[in-house]
Swiss-Prot record:
Belongs to the peptidase M28 family. M28A subfamily. GO terms for molecular function: aminopeptidase activity; metal ion binding; metalloexopeptidase activity. It comes from Aspergillus fumigatus (strain ATCC MYA-4609 / CBS 101355 / FGSC A1100 / Af293) (Neosartorya fumigata). This is Probable leucine aminopeptidase 2. Pfam families: PA, Peptidase_M28. The record marks 427 as: Transition state stabilizer. The lineage of its organism: Eukaryota, Fungi, Dikarya, Ascomycota, Pezizomycotina. Residues 119-216 form the PA domain.
Amino acid sequence: MVTMKLLYLTSFASLAVANGPGWDWKPRVHPKVLPQMIHLWDLLQGAQQLEDFAYAYPERNRVFGGRAHEDTVNYLYRELKKTGYYDVYKQPQVHQWTRADQALTVDGQSYDATTMTYSPSVNATAPLAVVNNLGCVEADYPADLTGKIALISRGECTFATKSVLSAKAGAAAALVYNNIEGSMAGTLGGATSELGAYAPIAGISLADGQALIQMIQAGTVTANLWIDSQVENRTTYNVIAQTKGGDPNNVVALGGHTDSVEAGPGINDDGSGIISNLVVAKALTRFSVKNAVRFCFWTAEEFGLLGSNYYVNSLNATEQAKIRLYLNFDMIASPNYALMIYDGDGSAFNLTGPAGSAQIERLFEDYYTSIRKPFVPTEFNGRSDYQAFILNGIPAGGLFTGAEAIKTEEQAQLFGGQAGVALDANYHAKGDNMTNLNREAFLINSRATAFAVATYANSLDSIPPRNMTTVVKRSQLEQAMKRTPHTHTGGTGCYKDRVEQ
């Protein structure tokens, strides 16, 4: 596999150098021109194609390694390859896929529950017991929890932590109830944890959790939790496309993820991001570039940022240093949207990205200002596909329009829409289809993407050179991410919202 990766890198670089001058006859891309070449019809047509892939199969989703996801990957590869403008390859990798069926009854009444990804199977009938506080330390767990089903509030720590601590306390299983309105999906982040063995674990709604607590306070409550988890290894692919022209030693990278959750086709999450990037990539073919542009389409984001982590970790230090910046586009057309920019300078959430991230944030701020659109920052905590880039000192930024977080009155005044309603009420649900896209946000953010691509394809003068003085130490950033509170004020969303709180 190492040899294969080196061959990819060698061929990629050599092709770029060999073919670069052949594109010089085209006019240089301009940040005022490229955005005007992005049209809503093209965006909607691409999104419809993704929905068609999902609905062609009984699963009606685009989970990584499934048939509709394979169709998505092959579609992106073909569309980019046929332009002749890019060197395109599919990067193979093997990751563990899992799904589950489940049922929860309490004193004979059925409740909706969602198994957390990577949970073990279980069929347990046992008393429910409330865990103190947020279940993030051993002291929160009652001494008499052995054989019982732990009932835990969402918040503060990862679901994996709650699962492991439940197991250590002897619980037969765990239920985590939401801390905001609505149901809850989650993941343990991986098949195993260095913290210890998992207890079977599922999520329930805030309303159901509160109702169960009241029942427990009135007397003994018996629950049956049945989880049937299925696990298999799946071969899947990233799609990487780099311009044949432009300096391959100064690469502008951008990306989004190609997979959905099991519940639905994922047309906003993240069909919006990958189709936007594809439309921008096609428009770019009419121009020449000074700096190489690399479009990245990541697999298995919903299972733990697997595709982007695999890719960045496959690059040696020399190849990583060629990537001058990374732009992330995940959920850019939420129906009740807010226009949000990742907080690269740390002014809003006290977590600063690698040197250059602040400049990326400023570029998007300037663009929104130029088209008279308001904007707000969103938390840059590394729990999206930019994580691997940040941890390796690569500056990052991007756009986001919100997930399950509730729109505030202030946001409604800025962006319109309905206060008191989720930014994306169909987040991680079967309703994330074509009807879930806000067309205005889709077009605004796709043109913002084009503006950024055209700007950086022309000049990277605003981005500091990559060297040891500009690299954020990995350990420092990881610790900062762990300390960052998850308050839902930034819209949350996607994988990062499923691993904790």
